[in-house]
UniProtKB/Swiss-Prot annotation:
Enzyme nomenclature, EC number: 2.1.1.-, 2.1.1.35
Gene name of this polypeptide: trmA
A Gene Ontology molecular function term of the record: tRNA (uracil(54)-C5)-methyltransferase activity, S-adenosyl methionine-dependent
GO cellular component: cytosol
Native organism taxonomy: Bacteria, Pseudomonadati, Pseudomonadota, Gammaproteobacteria, Enterobacterales
Cystine pairs: none
CDD domains cross-referenced by the UniProt entry: AdoMet_MTases
Pfam families: tRNA_U5-meth_tr
Stated name of the protein: tRNA/tmRNA (uracil-C(5))-methyltransferase
Length: 367
């Protein structure tokens, strides 16, 4: 696989290899057969970032070969959405012709949505002034005239210039409903929108008929908690990053959801609050004791759940665990298998043609 060419003909083979690998990893835990969710074979990634190479009068996107560290010129990037590919060409053509915009530009980050919106962030090794801002406004207007629904952002050391705002709104069809998700520049969003829809619909399916409330740790912009709200009486969710919490609050209102409460705290802090170890001002007005959470949802970082959080989740009858690293999932399952058994298993091909696997397990308390 190179940045310019995807081995589309090997898609099925690489997916079968991942499925076999996941089955082997789950063998010690008596997991059921995995449900397999495919990705589109190309143009599946909604985010991309490129370094910018200056070569006399020329200017172009580059990536580095992971093995050889060689520089590769990237004109088109079939991994990324078609919208990003169209903008890459138009943006670079426009910047090439404008010395003020190209000077010390070293990176461009792209974020796109299925709803047709884009953010392009231009990163510089120099201070950005009013003159830059004027040229950036002209660039934005030029690209909008070409049909791009675009937000343009300039970044330099300790500087961020937004010409309008730093977010775009995604609209995802999830099990018969359109869900609105505000996505903030430089904050985490699921990179593969088609697979994200599969994950949300699978999570809805496995929690069908659930009783009580849902607790979610690491909720981000509310991706899962808002979609799952329809299956539960109430949802209590935690998130540490301020921009994500703000986006989640917006998403709750935009989707007319009235049974989700977001708290800004880490999973570790929440564990302390639940165990009564510490009191937090942020929890004033929230009666944790009134929640009857029978299901807990976790989508942790690659490092998995820490020992204390594993102990916390073991107290719940149902654990829904989405993992972007099956190795740390297996390490957590070593502990969880003593109290819970796996009743559903899924493989989501979020990152085709790479060794990375995203998977989901539903664990239910042993009787």
């Amino acid at each position: 696989m190179t940045p310019n060419i995807l081995p589309i003909e090997s898609y099925d083979h690489q997916l079968a290899e991942k499925s076999a690998r996941l089955k082997a990893m789950m063998l010690p835990f008596q997991a059921p057969e995995p449900e397999i969710f495919r990705s589109p074979a190309d143009h599946y990634r909604m985010r991309a970032e490129f370094r910018v190479w200056h070569d006399e009068d020329d200017l172009y996107h580059i990536m580095f070969d992971q093995q050889t560290k060689q520089r590769i010129r990237v004109e088109q990037f079939p991994v990324a959405s078609r919208l990003i590919n169209r903008l890459m060409d138009a943006l670079m053509t426009a910047i090439r012709a404008e010395p003020l915009l190209r000077r010390k530009l070293f990176q461009i980050d792209y974020l796109s949505t299925l709803s047709g919106k884009l953010i392009a962030s231009l990163l510089y090794h120099r201070q950005l002034d009013e003159e830059w801002q004027q040229k950036a406004l002209e660039l934005r207007d030029q690209l909008r005239a070409q049909g791009f629904d675009l937000q343009l952002i300039g970044r330099a050391a300790k500087t961020k210039i937004m010409l309008d705002h730093d977010y775009i709104d995604e609209v995802l069809p999830v099990a018969g409903r359109e869900m609105i998700y505000r996505q903030v520049e430089n904050s985490f969003t699921q990179p593969n929108a088609a697979v994200n829809i599969h994950m949300l619909e699978w999570a809805l399916d496995v929690t069908q008929g659930a009783t009580g409330d849902l607790l979610e740790l690491y909720c981000g912009n509310g991706n899962f908690s808002l979609a799952l709200a329809r299956n539960f009486e109430r949802v209590l969710a935690t998130e540490i990053a301020k921009p994500s919490v703000a986006a989640a609050q917006y998403n709750i209102a935009a989707n007319n959801i009235d049974n989700v409460q977001i708290i800004r705290m880490s999973a570790e802090e929440f564990t302390q609050a639940m165990q009564g170890v510490r009191e937090f001002n942020r929890l004033k007005g929230i009666d944790l004791g009134s929640y009857n959470c029978e299901t807990i949802f976790v989508d942790p970082p690659r490092s998995g759940l820490d020992h204390e959080t594993v102990k916390l989740v073991q107290a719940y009858p149902r654990i829904l665990y989405i993992s972007c690293n099956p190795e740390t999932l297996c390490a957590n399952l070593e502990q969880l298998q003593h109290t819970h058994k796996i009743s559903r298993l899924a493989l989501f091909d979020q990152f085709p043609y790479t060794h990375h696997m995203e998977c989901g397990v539903l664990l239910e308390k042993r009787h």
